[in-house]
Amino acid sequence: MNQFKIHSPYKPTGDQPRAIKSISEGILKGEKFQTLLGVTGSGKTFTMANIIEKVQKPTLVLAHNKTLAAQLTSEFREFFPENCVEYFVSYYDYYQPEAYVPQTDTFIEKDASINDEIDKLRHSATSALFERNDVIVVASVSCIYGLGNPEEYKKLTVSLREGMEKDRDEIMRQLVDIQYERNEINFVRGTFRARGDVLDIFPASSTNIGIRVEFFGDEIDKIREFDVLTGNIISARKHALIFPASHFATSKDKLEIAIKKIEEELEDRVKVLTAEDKLLEAQRVRQRTNFDIEMMREVGYCSGIENYSRVLDGRAPGTPPKTLMDYFPDDFLLFIDESHVTLPQVKAMYGGDRSRKNNLVEYGFRLPCAYDNRPLKFDEFEGKLNQTVFVSATPAQYELEHSTNVAEQIIRPTGLLDPEIIVKPIKGQIDDLYASIKETIDKGFRVLVTTLTKKMSEDLTDYLKSMGIKTEYLHSSIDTIKRMEIIRDLRKGKFDVLVGINLLREGLDIPEVALVAILDADKEGFLRSETSLVQTIGRAARNSESKVIMYADNITKAMDKAISETNRRRKIQMEYNDKHGIVPRTVLKDIRDVIQTKVAEDEAEYKVNNNTDKLSKKEIEKLINKYEEEMKVAAKELQFERAAELRDEILKLKEQL
């Protein structure tokens, strides 16, 4: 049995030992929910790693976007080089779900670009969970979407052992059944090739290592790993387990049973639509479903096979899909990172998916079983939890109400204090900001400025550039990789000031930042809530000389709470430093290169419906209600740029009424 073992030159310090002991003991006692309330820069990831080492449980770490998941994965890999740390996120570089717009009679076909590297990492994660127990999977919220039945996935694996009597052609047939393709020329992931008594297999979870099976008659003589590029033998193996090339792979027997059920559901649906005098819809659903059935019979799958996953799994209507969480053993541990953002995301997933599916089913593009190809509802998600640790600097009400233990981690290992907060009047804020920026840059540090609107960000960026200050504007239409490049360039000193509406999304923990300026801090709303302000203040918590300037004419309730909490933490930190003779020191953090794998932007720029001139008054009112709901969800998830765009669109629509 492999054990989790941390490799790090550092030992837990400050509040870390107490937090590690408290939460580890709680887990071993069987406590279901706990919270790690750790301020920015207090080493929450290191604390999580130490807890994993203490409790020795397979662990799922849930992050609220792909970029944070990638950062956490690389950190955990540094801490656990001997153990298995996997990355599981949506494998789409681009994804346009199928949808139907009845107002314009427009059907939008599903269009997607799958990232082969991320697909490989997903297969690597699921296969690792069946092969070993020392596994950490860092995932985005895509892990609550249907993934295929883990029991079927395990049952379909092809087990090959040295000395086993097995016909080569029989193994090839088994590989085809689990979605592998024979390809003698282009040997890539999910393919195999046969040359005489040698069978080469390129596993779906592998990057550059293939499995070579050599036969002597009908007996497996040798199993060896080889480099698929050079052909060099790497090592000999006694046993190899080949997992399916698709998470939705199904045995032939099960597929035939599922097809019969799909045909029955099709007949029932056609009867319903015909009775409602929806003849076009009835013909459409019959034609589309029969085409899918034909494809499944011929090649074992079809485009959009996930829409039949409930039937393929043999689940009853309305029952939750199998997800990554079902691939874990029962006693797994879950960390929900930045839980104040991640949990609202989990809650919002089901509603958005359901509303899109309604039109597809209603207008005959899909059978009702498509409803069950969906993310988990929140209560279903809760039902799959074993033991959970919420991790956040600003845990929300849900986390605090459910937790039997809240471990505070306020003392930073570096001795750094929460930044000093200065409140200044709005009048003359730009001139004052310019002077503060100049002072900070002259010391060799960087500046973050957060504004309320896109226009203000653009105007401020132009103004600062005209004054000779190297400034960049970080906005929602910039994709993940570009955002990371901008952050890296800020750290390298290619520019000195970063302006934006939402500077929380990447967890911008940049040691070089010594000033965070919050413009119009007293304008109450989702952009200036207590959580948002505390998180923004935290951006200045990696530098010993940092400070925060809030420009405001009044102290709002949110400001008062954020300032009070920051001062409370600052007092505790100062007392600890005085007692132990610690001098605060700026974090020295390596500037890592951008992740090589190209990932899709989680929060792609939100596309609102600009073609509203032809809508009736009733349709406009309906659209306003829809946007208001989406704006609230976006605000809860701290996606402020998206929420601000929706707010602007709502105001435009109200003018049309």
Swiss-Prot record:
Q: Where is the Helicase C-terminal domain?
A: 429-595
Asked whether the keyword Iron is assigned, the reply is no
Which molecular function GO terms apply here? Answer: ATP binding; ATP hydrolysis activity; DNA binding; excinuclease ABC activity; helicase activity
Q: SUPFAM superfamilies per the record?
A: C-terminal UvrC-binding domain of UvrB (SSF46600), P-loop containing nucleoside triphosphate hydrolases (SSF52540)
A Gene Ontology annotation in the biological process aspect, one of them, is: SOS response
UniProt keywords, alphabetically? ATP-binding, Cytoplasm, DNA damage, DNA excision, DNA repair, Excision nuclease, Helicase, Hydrolase, Nucleotide-binding, SOS response
- The yes or no answer to whether the keyword Cytoplasm is present is yes
The record's principal subcellular location, in a coarse class, is cytoplasm
Binding-site residues, ATP: 38-45
SMART domains for this protein: DEXDc, HELICc
A GO CC term attached to the entry: excinuclease repair complex
Looking at the record, the residues that make up the Helicase ATP-binding domain are: 25-178
The protein's matches in InterPro entries, at most eight in alphabetical order, are given as: Helicase/UvrB_N (IPR006935), Helicase_ATP-bd (IPR014001), Helicase_C-like (IPR001650), P-loop_NTPase (IPR027417), UVR_dom (IPR001943), UVR_dom_sf (IPR036876), UvrB (IPR004807), UvrB_inter (IPR041471)
Motif, Beta-hairpin: chain positions = 91-114
Subcellular localization is given as: Cytoplasm
What Pfam family does this protein match (any one)?
UvrB_inter
The record ties this protein, via PROSITE patterns, to: HELICASE_ATP_BIND_1 (PS51192), HELICASE_CTER (PS51194), UVR (PS50151)
Q: Where is the UVR domain?
A: 621-656
Known role: The UvrABC repair system catalyzes the recognition and processing of DNA lesions. A damage recognition complex composed of 2 UvrA and 2 UvrB subunits scans DNA for abnormalities. Upon binding of the UvrA(2)B(2) complex to a putative damaged site, the DNA wraps around one UvrB monomer. DNA wrap is dependent on ATP binding by UvrB and probably causes local melting of the DNA helix, facilitating insertion of UvrB beta-hairpin between the DNA strands. Then UvrB probes one DNA strand for the presence of a lesion.
Entry text on domains: The beta-hairpin motif is involved in DNA binding.
PANTHER family documented for this protein: UVRABC SYSTEM PROTEIN B
Q: Which family does it belong to?
A: Belongs to the UvrB family.
Subunit (UniProt): Forms a heterotetramer with UvrA during the search for lesions. Interacts with UvrC in an incision complex.
Record protein name field: UvrABC system protein B
Source taxonomy: Bacteria, Bacillati, Bacillota, Clostridia, Eubacteriales
